[in-house]
Amino acid sequence: MFRNKLIFTTAVCATLVTLSAEDKPVSYYNDVVPVLKRSCNGCHHPGKLKGDLDLTTHAAFKKGGKHGSAFKEGDPKSSNIIEEIAGKDPSMPKEGDPLSQAEVAMFERWIAEGAKDDTPADKRNPFKIAEPPIYTSPAVISTLAYSPDGELLAISGYHETLLFKSDGSELVARLLGDSPRIESVAFSKDGKLLAVSGGAPALMGEVQIWDVQKRTLIRAMQLSSDSIYGVSFSPEGDRIACGGADKSVRLLSVTDGKELFKFDNHSDWVFGTTFSVDGKRVLSGSRDRAMKLINASNAQLIDDINKLLENVICIARHPKEDVIAYGGDMGGVRTYKMQENQGRTAANNDVNLVREYERQPAAVHAICYSPDGSLLAVAGAANEIPVYKTADGTRAGTCKGFTGAIFSLTPHPTKPLLAAGGFDGKVHQYILPTGDETNSFVPFPIKNKAVATR
């Protein structure tokens, strides 16, 4: 008797628990998202849009892909996603186990209940920070650039780009953004805009466009699921090119942020981009060893301009000519004509090679021309910066004073100065071509106070 009552009571409790769970609406954030992450996002994220479908956000999920909207609120029977995941032989996911019957039913009920997005406000953008960071030690400087008038110096920080007076005497603005890592910065030719690229490795890649005078963000574009590198402005300032860890080259409209093209001919990370003097061609440099010349109007590959010798880590175009300099992972420094490389394949010729410079003792991470193109500065894992004459390739001077690798160089537009940043977290400024150090400072507000060392 007692045993029968116990069984009856247990059964009733189980039924009540089940009914209670079914009465509770399906949560997009707590129920749907975990299944999407496990079974779907591997093929449907910004860096890999199978079927043009992105399932990483509610808005993108709702938008759907090439077959139309993924779901229709309140009507699971008319929703494409249910057709794809349900049945004895579902077409999705392509790889991995099919969703369980309970998971399919959960999707159906979520859609029937209106397919609402209940993502908490503080989780909608996991990269956003409310306040500028406080540094406890100098951060690695991955990129820096002088403004065209020479008045400002943009320096990479954590989640921000710092704008200093060019001599380092004053921090004038902190441009806070979503990207934890800032990989490249570039001013437009007129100095009115600043483009910033970066992201969160393996999670998000972004390009930001800033109004330099107002110190305000005009637009931020999350383009991929991995970091964006090598941002550059067209001569007219109406387009931006950038590379990415997703092996792509993108061309973006400055006016509206529209992606004008996505070039997928590289087979490894793309670290650098630049435009030809007339703006009609884009050149990209990649870890796949190739520098590719691309038609800027239609994204067609024109040619690989170089012989494939080593990973291309950094590139810089001559300020007045269609000549490109690159630094490689094996210490190579070479300059090439930015033109078709016809006839290279028969005898493995390097027909566009202009000059091969002194080999560096370690990988080259940064390279730049002086404003008149007469000097070429090179930096990397070796903690000094040799400066070469482009006329004959001889060394004109050497910049010293670093205690670690150097990741970025920028020439002052109106003075014979070179700024460099890297692992030691300081900006070093040198006189060209001799390499005499004239100034160094830590640009990061450590405990709310910028620390200068000289």
What residues fall within each predicted segment?
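Bacterial N-terminal signal peptides that target proteins for export
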Residues: 1-10
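Secretory pathway export signals and precursors
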Residues: 9, 36-39, 238
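Secreted/luminal cysteine- and crosslink-motif detector
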Residues: 14, 41-44, 315
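A subset of signal/propeptide-processing and intrinsically disordered low-complexity segments
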Residues: 17-18, 26, 283, 419
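WD40-repeat beta-propeller superdomains and closely related acidic/aromatic-rich repeat-like regions
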Residues: 118-454
